[in-house]
Structures are given as C-alpha cells and as structure tokens.
C-alpha cells in the first residue's frame, strides 16, 4: 500500500446522507476475485442519471469526495473502498462514517476524514461556487484546506499511522516476521505449522 501524507484534488459534492455500501457498489458488481476493476460499479444505481454529480465536468475528474453523514454504512464490503479508489478517489470527507467502512478505508489506503457537518456544508458551498475547487487533505497535520478555509478533521491514531506508513494487513504482519518464525521454530514437532515457501 502506498503511504498517504497529503493529497490535493478536485472536490466532488455528494449531497446525500446515509449512503450505504450497496449504494456505493451494488452486489451485482462483486463477482471479481481481484481488488481492482470496480470503478464501473461505483454508484452504479445513480450514474445512469445524466445529472448525477460524477457525470458532470469537472467533478468527473474529482479525487476528494465530500459526502453527507453516515457514509459507508451497511454491510461490510471492502469492495466499496476499492471501487472509490479504482475510480480515483483518495479522500472521502463526511461528518460520520460507518465503522466497518472507516476501518476498511484505512487498511486500503483511502483517507476517511471526519469533520463537523457544518464543515461539510461549507465545503459543498465552496465547491458549488467554484466547480473544480482543489481540496487538500494533510494527514500529518489532520487538516483540510479549500481556498482560504482550513478545517480540522478526525481520524483514529492507528488508522492515521497505518496510512502514513503505508501499512496494509500483509505489511503489518511482515513487520512481525522474526517473531512469527521464532514461534514456529519453538513449536513442538507434532503441532501444526506453516511450511516454508517453495
């Protein structure tokens, strides 16, 4: 996973609340066994509407999604995060995230930045007044910058650390490789053990 420090991109106003993972990517698109190729399923139920925000320029090139409260609720679906990232999003800003979505985002390299709902409303207003407005998310300082506006955001320390270090689950496990090998080496011969790679 690539480390995340700062990201700047076009802000996309998604003026919807309670966007669950089935709305982010419907189940019919979950048939792949890889982590890529889900961008076509992103918001598929809404993208058939020509007036949907991702069908409008310059928002179709956006990488910072500004969503209403309760974004990513519903079933545990890593594909929701993968679809957002495959489309090009690197940051999602909301006043409240589904817990599982927030965890999946941090594990995959997507920044889920939690701000006050008043700040979401302000960002929507700024974006709609200046389509193409660049928004910058600085994870180290935990601030969002849009034009002259600077807003703090919340993220749990563990997720922030993983993003800053670029650590997915495999990379975290590999950091403990010496301990794992020592444990395996100390196990009694009759206990199950992992085999070395060929």
Curated annotation (Swiss-Prot):
Chain's gene name: leuD
Subunit structure: Heterodimer of LeuC and LeuD.
Enzyme class: lyase
A GO term, aspect molecular function: 3-isopropylmalate dehydratase activity
EC annotation from Swiss-Prot or TrEMBL: 4.2.1.33
Gene Ontology cellular component list: 3-isopropylmalate dehydratase complex; plasma membrane
Site of covalent link Isoglutamyl lysine isopeptide (Lys-Gln) (interchain with Q-Cter in protein Pup): 154
Cited SUPFAM superfamilies: LeuD/IlvD-like
Protein name: 3-isopropylmalate dehydratase small subunit
Keyword set, alphabetical order: Amino-acid biosynthesis, Branched-chain amino acid biosynthesis, Isopeptide bond, Leucine biosynthesis, Lyase, Ubl conjugation
General function of this protein: Catalyzes the isomerization between 2-isopropylmalate and 3-isopropylmalate, via the formation of 2-isopropylmaleate.
Family note: Belongs to the LeuD family. LeuD type 1 subfamily.
Ubl conjugation as UniProt keyword: yes
Annotated metabolic or biological route of this protein: Amino-acid biosynthesis; L-leucine biosynthesis; L-leucine from 3-methyl-2-oxobutanoate: step 2/4
Catalysed reactions, semicolon-separated: (2R,3S)-3-isopropylmalate = (2S)-2-isopropylmalate
One Pfam family from the record: Aconitase_C
Any one GO biological process: L-leucine biosynthetic process
